[in-house]
């Protein structure tokens, strides 16, 4: 049977391909040190696990859950925004639970994109922004993120005709893959831009809790007018080491939240209630869970950056996320350098061109590796003949 065009036109998912490549190498006996996928290596905090165990033992959680999420969970999310950002949210109309934020990101274009419609996507960017638009039959239009503009979209450079036709604009700060942060004035300009052109902003805040060196990332929702023009996705995956739990949310503009919820009622059956109780515990439990996590990534970053710079590779210091976005040495493109390092040392860095055309010339280095393995990686690189200058 021939595949549908939507599958034929869909590129392979970057991280699935990375998994396959690393698995092949391990089968061949390679001791792989992967800085590739942003999957925290630490365990979920004990208080969250214990709440999950308690909830699983309660038979009332074993039935079909609510499509939009338990009221208690949605209320906790709303309270979290109030306490952290001073933003009031209606848990009944402005909050919907998600089976991880990726699910909501993938479903949103189906709410608004008809065949041929335009959505703006950051480049480089999380691949799901582009593929979700393609699956909905839309046309993703790249918005370059370049170092000269601090990896922020230049809103004034977006073609007027494109802006008038665009229906969605995916934004993500702190940013994956660049580790960039967005100042408050950028969000204010973004809201004005969206209001002018009647574009729905979809802000992906998956790394909102991973601010380093005392930096506290803002929320799109905290700015005046944000609820009028868009929504924000977030997840418990990265800050609480819960990538496998699949629990997140979307908040903001009520008609967009309603549309996203309507899609979900026809596709999935919601989040297992025991996981939602664990999510409530994550958002209301000890604050030192976040502090321990950010301290860990700061230490790893400092160790790795210092070691790579000693080798002559001038990598930047990220202020948020657990990613270092590093220029490859002269004479290589992203794939060539990543492959060369992997073949020589068994160390994997993700080639930047996997995140889009404007990711060429970079690699993404995830700090989801223990200090011991970081030291081992630095030693391997030091003993190799790889030129970093």
Swiss-Prot record:
Catalyzed reaction equations: (2S,6S)-2,6-diaminopimelate + 2-oxoglutarate = (S)-2,3,4,5-tetrahydrodipicolinate + L-glutamate + H2O + H(+)
GO function terms (MF aspect): L,L-diaminopimelate aminotransferase activity; pyridoxal phosphate binding
Coiled coil: none
GO biological process: lysine biosynthetic process via diaminopimelate, diaminopimelate-aminotransferase pathway
Keywords for this protein: Aminotransferase, Pyridoxal phosphate, Transferase
Pfam families in UniProt: Aminotran_1_2 (PF00155)
Keyword Transport belongs to the record: no
Signal peptide range: none
SUPFAM superfamilies found in the cross-reference section: PLP-dependent transferases (SSF53383)
E.C. no: 2.6.1.83
Residues that bind substrate: 13, 38, 102, 126, 176, 364
Record's subunit section: Homodimer.
Name this polypeptide is given: LL-diaminopimelate aminotransferase
Gene responsible for this protein: dapL
